[in-house]
Amino acid sequence: MTANNPQNRYDYDVVVIGAGHAGTEAAAAAARLGAKTALLTTNLDTVGQMSCNPAIGGVAKGQIVREVDALGGLMGEAIDATGIQFRMLNRRKGPAMHSPRAQADKKAYQNFIKYRIETQDNLDLRQETVEDLITEPIADGQDRLANQRVIGVRVRGDAVYHAPTVILTTGTFLQAIMHTGKSQSAGGRAGEGTTAGLSGALKGMGFTLDRFKTGTPPRLNARTIDYSGLEEQPGDDDPQPFSYLNDAISSPQMACHIAHTNERVHDLIRANLDRAPMYSGQIDSRGPRYCPSIEDKVVRFADKSSHQLFLEPEGRQTCEVYVNGISTSLPRDVQDAMFRCIPGLEKAAIMRYGYAVEYDYCPPTQLWPHLESKSVSGLFFAGQINGTTGYEEAAGQGLIAGLNAARTAASKTPWVPSRQDAYIGVLVDDLVTSGTDEPYRMFTSRAEYRLLLRQDNADRRLTAQADELGLIDAARRERFHRKLAEIERGTELLQQAKFQPETGPTVRGDVYLRRPEVTWNVIAEQVPELAGIGREAAEQCSIDIKYAGYIDRQQAEVHKQSRHAEKSIPVSFDYDKIGPLRNEAKEKLTKVRPLNLGQAKRISGITPADLALVLAHLENNSLSQTKSSASVDKRASSDNESSRPTSSASDSL
């Protein structure tokens, strides 16, 4: 939509639409960079709300939260302040697999995020309903691909927010429909409506939209659960914080509990599949593979006689319990009957029924790696609108979109972490390069260099870059440098210490620490000076030393792979000019517009032969340009020489 002259106009550098986990991180990041930012949401009471499970982190997700924190984001501090149970997953595996996870006090988490947004400099939080995007055409030649630019948004009530950059973080609210049995209603979350106008606006701009589905389980009243026969799942004895600003977690922890479904439950579900929207044909959108509904579990894993259910308290001052593992859109009467068949839950009262949500998303191959639209300059996308699932994935995207919107508004070049620098880099690259045909969830297996992308070293990977970008404050900077100094001091002390093993010659402390049975604490008992090294610095020293060989090999592999991978490809590169290139390759490369050979390599269907042709063409172009430049220089030199007087002429003068 083009601009007119509304009665009320507000001017900003960045406007963010939606105040969930992506929107709050986006707005906060833009504001930290000094951009005048507006965060618009239809309901101020749902800022930072946990729509589904009351937890942060998990396998690979916990690493993303640590990265968001290392870049100055909100999520790590929020869960440290409001968590009610902390666990480090995969402790029995190597450090690359360690993943922090915490249960949250749902309302306390939401209030923490909202207050941080309200008190952030350069940021205005407004309750508004956005009805349209305002754009203007771009003159030919001003942008190599985009044919229009965003200049603001129109909200309900004859008002306009003008800005050179806009970020869409609309979650599951685009054209959203909720399903419980045959019952349907418009809305992206129970008790709330949908955002219909923006889907139409995006389609009108030429964007392709598709549909995904997600779901949520029932919530039970804790007072009606018989915990006596359920397995208790406590938190860690030594809970570790998510944020690098915190040394420890001191708040008391609450236990979760484990229940199990059985054949009675499964038979009930099978008997009612014709009433399940996913199986009756009422829903034809694809849902998250790794968070299936209980209906899906019973059908897909028919040989299993039982499925685990995790009973997760939603806070310290509520009786609501989230039943992780039984997401469903079956009718209410079936949900009631299911719980009556589960030991410990026979008398459980449902406080909120489960439901499924269908919603529009924008396939992310329409974006550049910095999450700006290829066709509409200044328009950014982050979170579930890009086809992802999960609070953590949304937060990571939000931060990247926010900082790049602010940089774009200030006419600065974009910044995106690479795949070898961060899980966030893996996430963004996967989305914009390959897209996704199902809700995308991060796993450690998606990262080629996961030994380098550990949860313990996110600050060492990213905080220095965050400082250069202007994302962090002085307190975080000083704390980071103190930690680096501690790591250096700890390494020096280990190298200076001498140990006499039971067999063999005397060895240095760092050499002794490489032994599998030797821990930091064993050495610290004999080197009192190590007592001054903090827990995180000690952990870093230990991992650096124990896994030095593996880390060195992975870093060498990164260097090897990046030799050609970093070869840049012009945005307007014409693949049709490469005669021998397969038509499939031409189509896919033109669609994605990879910025370098590394990104081109990761496009599905692109072969090594295709890459070789592209590389050869790039090098030939470069060589031709070099020769052309040299020829011009030579002609210019010749012209200059001919314009100078010869020696004989000089003599005659």
UniProtKB/Swiss-Prot annotation:
Bias (Basic and acidic residues) ranges: 632-642
Chain residues that bind NAD(+): 287-301
Region (Disordered): 624-653
Cofactor requirements of the protein: FAD
Record InterPro entries: FAD/NAD-bd_sf, GIDA_C_N, MnmG, MnmG-rel, MnmG-rel_CS, MnmG_C, MnmG_C_subdom, MnmG_C_subdom_sf
Keywords on record: Cytoplasm, FAD, Flavoprotein, NAD, tRNA processing
Pfam families per record: GIDA, GIDA_C_1st, SAM_GIDA_C
NCBIfam families: mnmG_gidA
Name assigned to this protein: tRNA uridine 5-carboxymethylaminomethyl modification enzyme MnmG
